[in-house]
Amino acid sequence: MAILCFVFPLINDEFEQSLTVTLILIMAISTLFEYFFGIVYNLYLQADKKYYVVSYVQIFCYIFNILLVVFLIYMGASIVVVKIANTVAFIIKPIFQYYYVRKKLKIDYKKVTEDYKIENKFDGLSQHVAYVINVNTNVLVLTAFTNLATVAVYSIYNLVTTAVDRVVGAFTNGMDSIFGDMFARNERESLTKSFGMYEFVYYSVAMIVYLPTLILIIPFVRIYTSGITDANYIQPIFAILLVIFTLFSTTRYVYSSLIYSVGHFKQTNLIVWLEAIINVVLSVVLVYNLGLIGVAIGSLVAALFRLICFMHYSSKVILQRNFMKSFKWLFIVFFQLIVIILFMHFNIINYVPTDYLTWAFYALIVLILSTVFVIFVNVLCNFTLAKDVFQFIKGKLFKNKVH
């Protein structure tokens, strides 16, 4: 953080140095709180299958942040005040986790064995460092090699895809502990069957969310940036690439949740670092001639590389099943993407919403059609899995009715 405060004002001098440093420090506070107060208790709640507590607090923080920021902007508050409010909203989560675990669950820290050692802790740390590099590559490369207008365009689209990623990624919450428990009990057959059904549900949910995003993101940005003329915010090719990259980045959670649940950090360390290296190298090389599209291509290739590697590792090493059972999902995903992109290219759905209300109506129609399309294709390609999932859901519903 100290390096960023010193170096960034030298790279970008569009604002006063004091303002730049102040904003960096304000934005860093929520991250510091998350890692120094919240991360340990977050992981504990996840391992204890109480991640719903984190989800509820997170939802509250998001809503509170939106209301607070909108109010301050409406009142004409400065960017510094708005960012302080944003930080305050998000430090609620780690502070709540800290007190919830320590008070409500009443952990006795005196019973902790002094000579206990966490295996692979440095490999886990190494993967996190690679993750931080990877998720910040796009912004850093664009900041260093392009102008502020380009970064602003990226930020708008990234705002949408990040929100979508969090919605879909929520379906992996708690799966680590479930898979880890099955693996520890050596219930390989149950683990393999459960994971297959989980793949089906996760890919179905992901495509039901991401296909509408592919169609709706440009109309949303057009409405969101109406009247703003500092940059060309309508970037359809970049939008498509960024959405597909985020889709691949999100779907890897299916396999990373399995890999990390069995503690295979060291075995997958190289894959994670290669992803970061591919992303950085391709983004830097391509940004000169392609700008936004260049960094999107770099991120997409890197995410696809890691997704395939994690697919292969989880299938061959952990589940000990045919790799094609996972790999065929890529063919299904690409088929669905191509169909939607062709629909967009030939303007088959020729409707342009003009405000948020008409956009919401349009989004509802697109969501319904996408849901029908995704379920039809996924069931057609995975009939046996679909049947197992249906029986599982039916059993759960029937059980709840009985009780």
Regions of interest found by a model, annotated:
Residues 344-403:
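Membrane-proximal transmembrane or re-entrant/amphipathic helices at the cytosolic face
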Residues 79-80, 95-136, 140, 174, ...:
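Interhelical loop/hinge segments that connect adjacent transmembrane helices in multipass membrane
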Residues 6-27, 216-246, 354-357:
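Interfacial segments at transmembrane-helix termini and the short loops linking adjacent helices
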Residues 30, 85, 91, 122, ...:
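Alpha-helical transmembrane segments of polytopic membrane transporters and translocases
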Residues 56-103, 118-120, 127, 158-161, ...:
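Hydrophobic alpha-helical transmembrane segments
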Residues 46-47, 161-199, 255-261:
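Helix-loop junctions and terminal segments of transmembrane helices
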Residues 20, 79-80, 116-120, 124, ...:
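Interfacial/gating helices of multi-pass transporter permease domains
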Residues 33-56, 80, 101, 105, ...:
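Membrane-interface junctions at transmembrane-helix termini in multi-pass inner-membrane proteins
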